[in-house]
Amino acid sequence: MAKETAVEVKIEDRTLKLTNLEKVLYPEAGFTKGQVIDYYTRIAPAILPHTRDHPLTLKRYPNGVDAEFFYEKNCPKHRPPWVKTATVWSGGNNRDMYYCLCQDLPTLVWLAQIATLEFHTSLSYASNLPEPRTMVFDLDPGPPATIVECCKIGLMLRDVFAEHGLDCCAKTSGSKGLRLYVPLNTKVTYEETKVVSKGLAQLFEEQHPDLVVHKQLKELRTGRVLIDWSQNDQYKTTVNVYSLRARARPTVSTPVSWDEVEKCLKAKDPSLLVFNSDQVLARVAKHGDLFEPVIKKKQKLPKSLVAATGGAAALEKMANRRHSTSGRLRKPPAK
C-alpha cells in the first residue's frame, strides 16, 4: 500500500493538513485531488459570495467519481473548530441537523480536502430559512433532447419574466441541463415561489406539450424538457454555481450570458455550453462573476406573475388549510 502523503499549509490565519494530493479523483481526465483543491482555491473569490451563510449539503467522493459517493447534511464531527455550522430543524428526522457553512477560503479548502466535489446549497440564508433569496427553474432534458432544447425553453421563460419586469440569470448544471435563477432578495416565502414556479411549468406544458413536462415521471420525459420547479423548497439544496460536478471530466456549473444561450440554440451544439475547471477560471478572469445579480439584485415577485400562473388561488387555498390545521401542526422543540 502506498504511503499517505501529507503537507501542512497556512491559509489566511488557519493551518490545514492536506493529504493524498496526487490521488486521481477523475480517472478519465487524470484530474487529482490536488487539482480539485487548486480549483476551489482559485475560484474562491467567485464562489464564496454564493455559498456564504447558506446551509450546505456536501457530496463527497473519497475514492473518485467512478466509486461510491455520499451526501452529508450534518457537518462532519471531525471538522476544524473554526468551521461554522447552521442549526436546521429536520421534521423528517425529528431532530436538529448541523449544516456546514462555507464562509471563507480555509473552510472551502478543508471541504475540498475531504473530497467534497459538489457543493449543494439552500436557496435561503441560515438566519432566515423560510424566505428564499431566489426562485429557481431547473431545465432537465430527457434524451434525445439536450441542453439545446433547454436553451429554447430558457429563452422563452426569460421573455415571460421580462414581460412582468423581472430579470433572470442562467447557468449550466455542469451536467446535462440549464438552470434559471430569478433574483429576489426581498421578503417572499417558499409558498409563493413554489406556486408561481409550478404554475408556470404547468402553463408551459399546456402550451408546448411536445417540448415541456412539469412532472418527473420518466415515461413522460423522452425528447422533452422537464421544468423542475420543485427545487423551490425550504428543505432542499441545489448545486451551487461554480461547483465541480462528478462527471467523467471536471465540468463546472457555469454562469452563461443570454448571448451564449442564443448561440447554442442557433448552432444546435450542446458542446458550446460545457465548461471545465480551467475554462471557468479563465472566464471569471475575463468577465467577472456573471451570477453576481443573483445575490445583489432586489426584485419583488410581481402580483401580475402570481395571477398569471394561478398562484393567487393556490396561495389562498394553502392559507385556508394552514388555518384549519394550525392547532395540530407539530413544532420543533423550543431552543
Question: How would you label these PLM feature ranges?
Answer:
Residues 1-30, 37-38, 52-53, 114-134, ...:
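C-terminal accessory nucleic-acid interaction domains of nucleic acid-metabolism proteins
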Residues 2-130:
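Active-site loop/lid in soluble adenylation, ligation, and acyl-transfer enzymes
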Residues 42, 152-159, 195-203:
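Long, highly charged amphipathic alpha-helices
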Residues 49-51, 161-167, 208-209:
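Short secondary-structure junctions
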Residues 98-173, 184-186, 190-192:
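Signature for HUH/AEP ssDNA processing cores
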Residues 179-185, 226-229:
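A short beta-strand motif that forms the metal-chelation/ATP-contact edge
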